[in-house]
Amino acid sequence: MNKNNAFIGLCLGLSMAFQVHAQKPVAAPMKDVNQVIDNTLDSLNKARTARPVPGSSRKGNNPVLFLVGNSTMRTGTLGNGNNGQWGWGYFAHEYFDENRITVENHALGGTSSRTFYNHLWPEVLEGVRKGDWVIIELGHNDNGPYDSGRARASIPGIGKDSLVVTIKETGVKETVYTYGEYMRRFIRDVKKRGAHPILMSLTPRNAWEDADSTIVTRVNETFGLWAKQVAKKEHVPFIDLNEITACKFETFGKEKVKYMFYLDRIHTSEFGARVNAASAAEGIRNYKKLALAKYLKPIEKDTVTGATRKKGCPVLFTIGDSTVRNEDKGDGMWGWGSVIAELMDTTRISVENHAMAGRSARTYLDEGRWDKVYNALRPGDFVLIQFGHNDAGDINIGKARAELPGAGGESKVFLMEATGKYKVIYTFGWYLRKFIMDVKEKGAYPIVLSHTPRNKWDNGQIERNTNSFGAWTRQAAEEAGAWFIDLNKITADKLQDMGFNEGLRVVGEYFKRDHTHTSLKGARLNAQSIVDGVRQIDCPLKNYIK
């Protein structure tokens, strides 16, 4: 018995020795710097019903572009923005010719390279065919404990280290590999299918290196570096999405970058998601001899906005609603933006009226009209901004063009009746501040106006917007550092004098068909009021007045 016990003891000792040898020390897991709770992965069955069936979008024999990532690519289970957060994968398809290639977003919030590979990848891989493309952007969640809680950390680095763990909550055993090893496994699996893998670095967070907030924190010493190293060794493309977007954020500045995110510092708003999607497309387009680029839509060049620019001269852009731009012909309704050039020295400055009837500040932005002006801006240009007439009413039904009232930082997610999609709506003043920040970013001059007065009277006094849109416009301008002209007051004072001295019949000649839209005479009156206001402020635009 003693000999048997000794033999058994020897075997146990050797077994333990071998286990210790197999479990040589590995690097500690990465710290969870995001501190964001995302339980999406905990509902895998629900997630599978929400995500597309792999390969189901394929048209004939066309290739499919599969997106593999986490919540920065697809937020939550549905990825539909119902919490105000959007992943860039939702908008990626807009950059591709979907008659030649389709895009499927298989990302899932809360996943790491390890958990995606173990739980979701086998199913995605089933849909991958020869000639397809797979973009892999993972790493945000490769942190925390190896063997408890979310148990999603990969071993830092790209080495061959491994670690056998037993998940404390479930008792399930699992071998954990390095981040680089998971990337290599993705790559090998894709190549075996005859498809093309692409690695991307992580989207940047709203984090800055310096006290002045001029340098965005990169991942070029961790996940970005490791993905790049693996891509090089495996001879696959690497696109530094982190660097491309971070450079844009640094141009935007800290205040503008804030609204690129929603609720936290890692998950993007629609604005930020669209920036990341554009950066991904830019990286694909600029990567030398990357065949995926041939499926991108051609870049559409705007040949209209800013086309009047004379060499060495600024442009005065006007944006707003129908009181700024209307029919602008004959005896019809006119907007002041179509006549203000009469008061400018057009040998030294050109004037372009980009207002559109029926628009609020929000819908002018949502329809992409502002983007055209923004992209055309050059240092030294001027932008006259006037909204307010169409910014009240329904937010998500009917015309659905209103904002939240006020000029604060509030926002709310609404389900839009017309589109069936979720959208974050901000205050009226927020949209004005965005326009102002964008103008200043380009080195141009923003001038914000309270909206034109209506031909509405109460006990002999013309109606003014002093306590509503006028006040919110002034507040937004002052907070964002723009010039403010109280157009509503300047013109209202003139109309008040006419109404008091000569009767309302004379005032009526300045309007057309209703109490809001102006005749040519009224448009010229408002244009003159703007010039009067410019002369009262210390704005360089006064140097271009006749």
Model-assigned labels for residue ranges:
Residues M1-P25:
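Bacterial Sec-dependent N-terminal signal peptides
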Residues A28-A107, P122-V134, A153-S154, D302-M356, ...:
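Serine-esterase "nucleophile elbow" of acetyl-processing enzymes
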Residues T77-G81, A211-R218, D328-D331, Y364-L365, ...:
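Short, solvent-exposed loop/turn segments at secondary-structure boundaries
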Residues L108-S113, A207, M356-A361:
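Acidic helix-start/capping segments at beta-turn-to-alpha-helix junctions
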Residues S112-E123, S360-K372:
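N-terminal post-signal-peptidase region of extra-cytosolic proteins
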Residues E123-E270, R274, A281-K289, K372-H517, ...:
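Alpha-helical cap/lid subdomain in secreted, periplasmic
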Residues K297-V304, K546:
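A short, charged, Gly/Pro-tolerant segment at domain boundaries
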